[in-house]
Amino acid sequence: RQEVLEMARMMMESAVAVRSYTVSEIKPLLSVQQRRAFIPQTVPAYAASQYIRRLQESHSEYSYKEATLNPTNPANRTTEWEADVVYHFRNQPGEKEIIGERITPTGPQLYMGRPITITNPECLACHDKPSNAPQTLIDTYGSNNGFGWKLNETIGAQIVSVPMSLPLARAQS
């Protein structure tokens, strides 16, 4: 279990690093172009998800999702079990991480979740009201989802899932 947990932590920290890099270095470079066309590469959640998607080319059994109750991009909408993780963080505001196990069609998986809480007022420039959002974002995703977020609200969870089957097999041999 410890080995699987370390793999999950490495994936989570990698996604967090990509998000941070995107906010500090990519988004400022493309702010002018963003006025003419929506550039998803400037969105931290998109950058982290794309990074993990590339990692999945060689490790398809690993996953990362920015699971959101009211996402801008429908691909980020929570499944039932992911919503339980988000509500856990909403009900336990001080908690920073949850670790659990679940059975999937491919075998047991360990998951690690961390809350996505809106702490940066800049997020509300796109996610408060559709009328305040950049038109390029509305043109891409529409005006029905990803709005109404509030400062200090937990709107989702970063969730990493890692298979337990390989380390379990190694431990048994």
Question: Where do the protein language model's features map onto the residues?
Answer:
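Extracytoplasmic c-type cytochrome modules immediately beyond a signal peptide or single-pass transmembrane anchor
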Residues: R1-I118, E122, A133-S173
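Short, cysteine/histidine-rich loop/knuckle motifs that typically chelate Zn2+
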Residues: A125
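Short functional micro-motifs and their immediate structural scaffolds
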Residues: D128-S131
